[in-house]
């Protein structure tokens, strides 16, 4: 009984540590008190101010745009890479797998400096394209590993049987591999979208003054204190994240049935 109680108490403390700050943030986004020190009544005032703050709205649009295209490109390239690693034998296969894990384990600051040096050598100006390429780079390994792990759990004899029955590689890819990998594809896209939307370190190195994204804008604002508009914006982002998670679960459940 005591062990059961301690386990549940520990889990309660962990979840409280994770979610109480989020609850406070969401609550303060509706609080009339600017500093959130006490509850002074429900108000939509901070959301109205947020939507009148053109700088924050523009930064949010930039972030969502970068995250969408980065996640989509990373999912396409990462999916094809995962299929190649799972389906075919080729020289350098182990090296490709190793490089993916190296990118995943590299500190953000190392990734940021490396990409900045590359863009300077190649001549890519800092802005939209440098941000997009950087975000695709650090999202790609996560998508590849997610999809490959899903494919690696399937019996490859099913693919060989389809090939023996005369199915072409395109048919096998379209009729067997892609439907089986769909939950991992959706998960990989959502993971990439979240990682891209949340990145600060790499983005701070490769972004230009002409294309400011939301994490960098918020980072510059919180140096002087968290404003209620930031709380309101964070609440909207939380709702968006929850909606994406629910959508992912619905797609996965539909595919499994």
Curated annotation (Swiss-Prot):
Q: Which UniProt keywords apply?
A: Cell inner membrane, Cell membrane, Membrane, Transmembrane, Transmembrane helix, Transport
List the InterPro entries: Bact_Polyamine_Transport, MetI-like, MetI-like_sf
How is this protein situated with respect to the membrane? Multi-pass membrane protein
Report the main location listed first in the record: membrane
Q: Per the UniProt entry, what are the Gene Ontology biological process annotations, in alphabetical order?
A: transmembrane transport
Q: Which residues lie on this side of the membrane: Cytoplasmic?
A: 1-7, 86-100, 149-176, 252-257
Span of domain ABC transmembrane type-1 = 60-248
Function, please? Required for the activity of the bacterial periplasmic transport system of putrescine and spermidine.
| Topological domains, Periplasmic | 28-65, 121-128, 197-231
The answer to whether the entry has keyword Transport is yes
What is the recorded name of this protein? Answer: Spermidine/putrescine transport system permease protein PotC
Entry annotated with the keyword Transmembrane:
yes
One GO CC term of this entry? plasma membrane
Where is this protein found? Cell inner membrane
Q: Which family does it belong to?
A: Belongs to the binding-protein-dependent transport system permease family. CysTW subfamily.
**NCBIfam families associated with the record:** PRK09500.1
